[in-house]
């Protein structure tokens, strides 16, 4: 069953990463690829993403997940959210020599499948 997730990223957060020499869009893509390849609980049959520009407020990351069991969707979304927050925090820490970035507001919203 395909589910669509949306993650809104504020323009200010993107600028902070850019000032640190990082491209948050590329980081999110790489994190999603690694996460998909791990195949959490064997419940993700496929995953894809695209970015929608929202000028000047930032962008939205849409992730389409093909999940085997909808009852585990909440756990799968939480695992993906944790993977993104932890990975972005580590990348930012390494790029800035120990600086911290506020990522607690990053969370996915589950939408109806936008492909149907």
From Swiss-Prot:
Sorted UniProt keywords: Early protein, Host nucleus, Host-virus interaction, Inhibition of host innate immune response by virus, Viral immunoevasion
GO BP annotations listed: symbiont-mediated suppression of host innate immune response
Location in or out of the cell: Host nucleus
Name of a matching Pfam family: Adeno_E4_ORF3
Keyword Membrane: no
Record keyword Lipid biosynthesis present: no
GO CC, one annotated term: host cell nucleus
Induction of its expression: Synthesized early during infection.
Free-text function comment from the UniProt entry: Forms a multivalent network in host nucleus that inhibits nuclear bodies and prevents antiviral cellular activities. The network is made of multimerized dimers and surrounds adenovirus replication centers and nucleolus. Plays a role in splicing of the major late transcript. Prevents viral genome concatemer formation.
Subunit organization: Homodimer. Multimerizes through C-terminus tail by reciprocal or nonreciprocal interactions. Interacts with host PML isoform 2 C-terminal disordered region. Interacts with E1B-55k; this interaction is necessary for E1B 55 kDa protein to localize to the nuclear matrix fraction of the cell. May interact with host TRIM24, CREBBP, EP300, PRKDC and the MRN complex MRE11/RAD50/NBS1; these interactions may happen through nuclear bodies complexes.
UniProt family annotation: Belongs to the adenoviridae E4 ORF3 family.
Protein name: Early 4 ORF3 protein
Higher taxonomy: Viruses, Varidnaviria, Bamfordvirae, Preplasmiviricota, Tectiliviricetes
């Amino acid at each position: 069953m395909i589910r669509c997730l949306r993650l809104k990223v504020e323009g200010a957060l993107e600028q902070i990463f850019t000032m640190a020499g990082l491209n948050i869009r590329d980081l999110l893509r790489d994190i999603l690829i690694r996460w998909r390849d791990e195949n959490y609980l064997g419940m993700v049959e496929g995953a894809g993403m695209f970015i929608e520009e929202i000028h000047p407020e930032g962008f939205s990351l849409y992730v389409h997940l093909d999940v085997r069991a909808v009852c585990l969707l909440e756990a799968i979304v939480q695992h993906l959210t944790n993977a993104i927050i932890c990975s972005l925090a580590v990348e930012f820490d390494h790029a800035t020599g120990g600086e911290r970035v506020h990522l607690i507001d990053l969370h996915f919203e589950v939408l109806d499948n936008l492909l149907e």
